[in-house]
Amino acid sequence: KTVLHQQNILTGAVVSVARTVLGTIFALVTNALLAYIISRKRFLFRSQLSLFWVITMYVNGGMIPTFLLYKGLGLTNNFWVYVIPGMVSAFNMLVIRTYMNGIPDSLEESAQLDGAGYSTIFLKIYSPLCKPVYATVALFVAVGQWNSWFDAMLYNRMSSNLTTLQYELMKLLSSVTNQGTSAEEMKNAAGTVTPTSVRAAATILTMLPIIC
């Protein structure tokens, strides 16, 4: 009851659901398209691009340059900062590409003999066959989007209408945990909400949609 009656909890829940749905859809589409492109053996720079994306998995630009970049692009205090940066993931893209590499080339060649273009081959042949890996990647992205709170703190902390459920729960848990622990305060706190109970309630709220 204490958790659910906190300010901005409902707004945060709506934003979290929206970012999870939109972020998953956009990420799945872009990663699938990129994976299809670099899985084509006739694509000239497939090896170089694959190496480039692998490097980005281990080396990033750093927090401050990333913040300045997002600010310059107008993504601070903006809902799309939750969606656009996650549209391309080297890991997810390589997972889909590896799955596509296991699909026989004869299927694509037969479709080309029938006059099918690359878009038709991708939509009508590869996408139906890649449903298992699409579902896996979608689950990865959805769980990551739902559990994320750090980007809300960095980029949208000044906009209460763009807060997320996880960020609000984190602030609540921090405020309860940082309450005084002197003997007198502990005596006066009898019967009030404890950090452990808040942590348990927050855990249930964040896990329930994923479990369902």
Predicted regions span which residues?
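A hydrophobic, multi-pass inner-membrane permease signature
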Residues: K1-C212
